[in-house]
Amino acid sequence: MAPKSKKVAPSPFAQPKAAKTTKNPLFVSRPRSFGIGQDIQPKRDLSRFVKWPEYIRLQRRRKILNLRLKVPPAIAQFQKTLDKNTATQVFKLLNKYRPETAAEKKQRLVAEAEAVANGKSAQDVSKKPYNVKYGLNHVVALIEAKKAKLVLIASDVDPIELVVFLPALCKKMGVPYAIVKNKARLGTVIHQKTAAVLAVTEVREEDKNELASIVSAVDANFSAKYDESRRKWGGGIMGGKTQALLAKRAKAAAATVRL
């Protein structure tokens, strides 16, 4: 027969009693349940579940495809754009040479007509205009004639085939060129929604030094690196899940080789 368990004698020392915490009656506990049909869910980012418009879905798919697929060098070079500081300088200069608006043109023609009526020539009233040149065919003709001093190409032209040949043409003709980020930003210079390409042919005497510094910065980024960009393919970047899977496979393959 198993021996009976003996009871341990209680400690002769007094046990310290835990002090009771008094709760403030003003703060009432209201536990919530976030099950289906229960309390209102906390606010969280639900953008993943939004049904976005078709054009947004298309541009997102296009971006993913450009990352995933192997992109030929001629198209991949449009992913490398002019840096922010130089682009700010360029647009600051371009804004001085914006084409005249309809109101400005009317004002100029009225002033010229009054001058002619008073026996003067039109050139006495209006100075020689210095404007940014735009229009794809016009700019191509200026590049071929080597009249363009700086060419700006938008990186997001659709279809890209419209401008894909321009970097090669500029390099062949020795014309400085730069790929800038936004066709809409180029469009604002010429009072239009978008512009694929702009060219600077002439500037005033006071802006020649600024243009020269911009051209030297642009040449270092694009013309000097043209041969490198001509050989460099783009894309081929997989998503996070695929990269993790490939890393896992590589790790397993390395472990089997070690064995």
From Swiss-Prot:
Keyword Plastid: no
InterPro entries reported for this sequence: eL8/uL1-like (IPR050257), Ribosomal_eL30-like_sf (IPR029064), Ribosomal_eL8-like_CS (IPR004037), Ribosomal_eL8/eL30/eS12/Gad45 (IPR004038), Ribosomal_eL8/Nhp2 (IPR018492), Ribosomal_eL8_euk (IPR001921)
Keyword Nucleotide-binding: no
Modified sites of kind Phosphoserine: S11, S33
Gene3D superfamilies in UniProt: 3.30.1330.30
GO CC entries: cytosolic large ribosomal subunit; preribosome
Function: Component of the ribosome, a large ribonucleoprotein complex responsible for the synthesis of proteins in the cell. The small ribosomal subunit (SSU) binds messenger RNAs (mRNAs) and translates the encoded message by selecting cognate aminoacyl-transfer RNA (tRNA) molecules. The large subunit (LSU) contains the ribosomal catalytic site termed the peptidyl transferase center (PTC), which catalyzes the formation of peptide bonds, thereby polymerizing the amino acids delivered by tRNAs into a polypeptide chain.
Name the UniProt record assigns to this protein: Large ribosomal subunit protein eL8
